[in-house]
A protein has these predicted regions:
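Structural preference for solvent-exposed beta-strand-turn elements
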Residues: 1-266
Length: 266
């Protein structure tokens, strides 16, 4: 397994997905990136079991295919020291030894067994709900609500963003029982009624990726997991189980007092 890749491009992709890696992993293999080279496509996966991120990079100079788990911290620390240059990865598939050749020298990394890396959860087709959304809409929905989520171990449903699909609108809700934010978009029509609770950590990771993208996002979910697919990236997260509070009941419907203020002055 051998390929050539830009040092800065690789680092950019690893930094995007590397934030999911926990400092307290229960499985040592989760301290690694999974490199999966097939044809001219390199898929790199990072996971903490609850959330999995996958990034895809198209390559031009490839010899053979294969998989290997690469120590995340070691690789990222090395890449941060390289200026922009082509890097050659040469992996011995029997020993899993990784030889990294740069313009300044040669480096060796001990890879891990890729078969130990956990499988990505799949959305069950018989229970799947799917829709296409503009990346701007998903970004705004997360960005305008995530600050209001709670950090409450006793009420985990409050620690995520409640996403509610209706026939003619899409609503994002977050509350910590002291403040509540409802962000509703009328410019989309899901044409179905459903909902899920998106945990805070993967929501934050997705927001970071969406801030650089202008595209369509494919959203699909079942009763256990949600998946977001956009150009070059995929994120799969386990959903928070439970019933979200009836947020509409605490929003006044006939409050006679209204105030309009300048946002910048405020």
């Amino acid at each position: 397994m051998k390929f050539v890749i830009s040092s800065t491009e690789l680092l950019k992709h690893l930094q995007s997905i590397g934030r999911v890696i926990s400092s307290k992993n229960t499985l040592p293999i989760l301290d690694n990136f999974l490199f999966d080279l097939s044809g001219n496509e390199l898929k790199i996966t990072a996971s903490d079991l609850e959330t999995t991120l996958v990034t895809t990079i198209e390559l031009e100079n490839v010899t053979d295919e294969g998989k290997v788990a690469v120590p995340a911290r070691i690789l990222m620390d090395m890449l941060k020291e390289f200026p922009e240059q082509p890097l050659t990865f040469d992996i011995n598939m029997e020993t899993l030894g990784i030889e990294l050749n740069s313009e300044n020298g040669k480096y060796n990394i001990v890879g891990q067994n890729p078969e130990d890396f956990p499988q990505i959860p799949e959305i069950k087709s018989e229970q799947e709900t799917m829709l296409q959304l503009p990346s701007e809409l998903v970004f705004q929905g997360i960005d305008k609500t995530i600050f209001a989520t709670a950090d409450d171990e006793l009420r985990p449903v409050m620690n995520g963003i409640y996403v509610e699909l209706a026939n003619e609108n899409l609503t994002f809700v977050a509350t910590d029982a002291h403040k509540l934010v409802r962000y509703r978009r009328q410019d989309v029509s899901p044409g179905q009624e459903s909902s899920f609770i998106f945990p805070k950590k993967p929501a934050s990771l997705l927001r970071n990726i969406l801030s650089r993208e202008e595209s369509q996002v494919e959203v699909s979910f079942d009763d256990k997991n949600v998946q977001f697919v956009l150009p070059g990236y995929k994120i799969v997260s386990r959903l928070t189980e439970g019933n979200y509070p009836n947020y509409d009941s605490v929003i006044p419907s006939d409050n006679p007092f209204k105030l309009t203020i300048d946002r910048l002055d405020f």
